[in-house]
Amino acid sequence: MGTVELLTREGEIDIAKRIEDGINQVQSSVAEYPEAITYLLEQYDKYEAEQLRLSDIISGFIDPNETEDMAPTATHIGSELGEDDLADEDEEDEEDEDEDGDSSDDDGDGGPDPEVAREKFGELRAQYEVTRLSIQKNGRAHEDTQAAIAQLADVFRQFRLMPKQFDRLVNNMREMMERVRVQERIIMKLCVEQAKMPKKTFVAAFTNNECETAWFEYQKQAGKAWSPRLVEMDEDIQRAIGKLQQIEEETGLSIAQIKDINRRMSIGEAKARRAKKEMVEANLRL
């Protein structure tokens, strides 16, 4: 029989760093989703109002200058917890809080330092405001805005979020992407399956024009075999385009930006998941 090499300390550190790299990529991607930052700031406001424990939100902070032998951020990436599972965790936390008494008591010993948290959340809030104002003034594509977004991601990456908080932010972004996909599937089904527009023609017209109606108006008037059918489906297609426009308004992101954030988030999740699988397999050999 062959022998299986056991995981060395160096190998364990390498896997841990790859897990952390994947999670950092997810967290940096999520930082570009405005709702993620506002949600986290709202959670901290609840802590200050004594509605939450600080340890319900974060486990601590990462010093960007001290990354050696750093343990991976706690997260359920790889276990695919859904909203129902996260809700169950919330209920368990509430029960624990009732048993423990005052929600502010657990932050004194071993939990996050409240003073450091106040400073870090203040920094996050300030940078979020700088980024928001730059987007309003210059647009997301502007050089100054891109620099502000990068700085916001750097600040956000320093937060060690509790698993349920991290995963809720990821799930929120995933659900937003699913809303986009639902409307895109509706539009494609109407155009390709029912109106018989060639899929290649549809993809060329629709891609990067998801919230525009010009491509649709052109195809209706193009005198093609599918044009009369598109006219008949005008109301349904316009409704779906309107819902995509609503998503852009809600998020402050274009559909293309939502897709790009989701793509980078998915790549980071895959990296972390692969490294976690390696860690589990290595531990099973022991």
How would you name each of these model-derived features?
Residues 1-286:
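Transcription initiation cofactors for RNA polymerase, centered on bacterial
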